[in-house]
A protein has these predicted regions:
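Residue-level signal for pocket-adjacent positions within structured domains
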Residues: 12, 24, 86-87, 206, ...
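Conserved helicase C-terminal RecA-like lobe
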Residues: 69-79, 94-267
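Helicase P-loop NTPase motor core
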Residues: 1-81, 107-108, 144, 155-156, ...
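Conserved helicase motor
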Residues: 66, 87-94
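Residue-level detector of flexible, active-site-proximal loop/helix-junction positions
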Residues: 33-36, 90, 194
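Short, solvent-exposed loop/turn elements at beta->coil junctions and helix N-caps
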Residues: 18, 88, 190-191
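General small-molecule cofactor/ligand-binding pocket signal
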Residues: 28-30, 84-86, 188
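Conserved beta-strand edge residues that scaffold enzyme active sites
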Residues: 63, 90, 246-247
């Protein structure tokens, strides 16, 4: 709790909380080269905890927007860890993703010489994606994030992959991300996690552009973003791990860690 309270020291946007339970493990902050590395490591850590006897229902992965869920959904599926998405649809069930997959399958049926990234980016553009995210929150931003995550999958394919290979990859991912039939790890936006707690929490994707979100520009908006970071951290009863990745497959620039780390880590 003291770790989260560092975010309140300068602005006082919320009354500092006092922990009522036993002292948990020291918070961890970890940087990764790529989003895939980040999510694979988080999935492996979660599987290790479950293998040690921690209930899956006592573990959560939190992120700023729904569009960030695809990479961790895939990593957990690959690790054989059941999960449930709180307050939102699973990635491959979203309307825009279903539309994109139909278009990708149609493109794969008539092979061309286009590189996979070009072919998929053209499909995503036809569905509303662009190189720059919408300036405001809401449905359009969520749709953009989902399509952006779909496009990012192309970066994981071998250089010689075709659009047909990409269609097969998407089919395999859909099959692996089945509905859980038992207690599962929770995936959630920070907003949807308000009021809930878990023994172990992983907060992922903590970069500039996500937390704080791109369209948060005023002092009040940035204060609200800091409050979201605080809310996320305080969802953990015993262990909190905060991670971010430098490499973004759909951007020409590397990402920077969230500015809120400066305040959190000021005293080590």
């Amino acid at each position: 709790m003291n770790f989260a309270n560092r975010l309140t020291e300068e602005t006082g946007f919320v009354e500092p909380l006092q922990s009522q339970g036993e002292v948990g493990l020291a918070p961890r902050t970890i940087a990764f080269a790529t989003i895939q590395d980040e999510c694979s490591a988080v999935a492996a850590a979660i599987k290790n905890k479950i293998d040690q006897g921690v209930k899956a229902s006592e573990i959560a992965v939190l992120y700023r927007v729904n569009g960030q869920s695809e990479a961790i959904e895939n990593a957990l599926a690959q690790a054989g860890v059941d999960y449930q998405v709180r307050g939102g649809e699973r990635f491959f069930n979203r309307v825009e993703i279903q539309a994109a997959i139909r278009a990708i399958r149609a493109e794969a049926a008539s092979p061309s010489e286009k590189p996979v990234f070009q072919a998929v980016s053209e499909i995503c553009r036809s569905l509303g994606w662009s190189t720059q995210p919408p300036a405001e929150a809401g449905v359009l931003r969520e749709k953009w994030e989902s399509l952006n995550s779909l496009l990012a999958i192309t970066d994981e394919l071998p250089a010689e992959a075709t659009i047909a290979d990409f269609a097969v990859e998407l089919d395999e991912r859909q099959r692996s991300q089945h509905e859980p039939i038992k207690a599962a790890v929770t995936l959630s936006t920070i907003h949807a996690a308000k009021g809930l707690e878990w023994q172990i929490v992983h907060m992922i994707g903590l970069t500039e552009g996500y937390l704080p979100i791109t369209y948060a520009t005023t002092e009040a908006e940035l204060r609200e973003e800091k409050r979201l970071m605080y809310v996320g951290i305080t969802r953990a009863k015993n262990e909190i791990t905060l991670t971010w990745a430098k490499r973004d497959a759909t951007s020409t620039r590397d990402r920077e860690p969230s500015r809120f780390f400066n305040q959190l880590l000021a005293r080590g």
